[in-house]
């Protein structure tokens, strides 16, 4: 089973799990996808939406606890990525500098100086980008507090926003009938972003 199929059936397969374990599972996935480079393939959007559906369907799950943990996991994950880029990535590039690397760093610094705040916020909604943008921001030495504020806003808009969309899809009658269409939107968006990124790289 593919990761996208697993995410799409998250509410069905993991609903029997005890609430505490479900919290830990969702928070762990969010942190890994946003903070650990090797976990860029995790389908965070679909997981968040499905977690909201599960929270609405279970009486023993607290949506406030769920979204608070998701916010913290997303926020801390991006902070880890930023610090990794700044403390490890930048020194490594400076140690192994070349004209090509210097040009890349200069371009990254110029981009983050002009568009960094919005890039960090918007990257949350694009698979892969939300994993790699924070460490690149660190490498480019984006001002810490500027990154901090963008990270917080992005964590709320993405982590809390998508989870609550799933939650209300299952609790509001007018939206419930469209819950699968909304879930499909997030899954298709994830697939399209991967396809576009790969096509641009070739």
Model-derived segments and their meaning:
Residues 1-28, 53-146, 171-186, 193-202:
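Membrane-interfacial helix-loop-helix
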Residues 27-48, 123:
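Transmembrane alpha-helix interface/packing and boundary motifs in multi-pass membrane proteins
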Residues 35-44, 142-145, 149, 201:
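Membrane-helix interface "capping/anchor" motifs
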Residues 67, 151-152:
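Short hydrophobic/aromatic, small-residue-rich stretches within specific transmembrane helices
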Residues 128-132, 152, 156-159:
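Hydrophobic alpha-helical transmembrane bundles that constitute the permease/transmembrane domains
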Residues 157-168:
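Transmembrane alpha-helical segments of integral membrane proteins
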């Amino acid at each position: 089973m593919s990761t996208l199929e697993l995410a799409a059936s998250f509410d069905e397969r993991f609903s029997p799990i005890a609430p505490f374990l479900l919290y830990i599972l969702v928070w762990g996935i969010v942190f890994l996808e946003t903070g650990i480079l090797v976990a860029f393939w995790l389908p965070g959007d679909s997981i968040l939406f499905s977690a909201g559906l599960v929270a609405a369907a279970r009486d023993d799950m607290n949506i406030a606890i769920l979204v608070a943990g998701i916010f913290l996991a997303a926020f801390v994950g991006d902070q880890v990525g930023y610090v990794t880029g700044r403390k490890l990535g930048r020194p490594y590039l400076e140690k192994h500098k070349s004209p090509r690397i210097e040009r890349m760093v200069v371009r990254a610094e110029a981009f983050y100086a002009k568009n960094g705040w919005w890039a960090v916020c918007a990257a949350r909604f694009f698979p892969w980008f939300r994993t790699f943008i924070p460490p690149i921001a660190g490498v480019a030495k984006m001002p810490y507090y500027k990154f901090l504020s963008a990270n917080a806003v992005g964590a709320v808009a993405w982590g809390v926003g998508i989870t609550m969309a799933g939650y209300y899809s299952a609790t509001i009658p007018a939206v419930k009938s469209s819950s699968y269409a909304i879930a499909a939107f997030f899954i298709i968006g994830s697939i399209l972003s991967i396809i576009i990124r790969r096509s641009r790289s070739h």
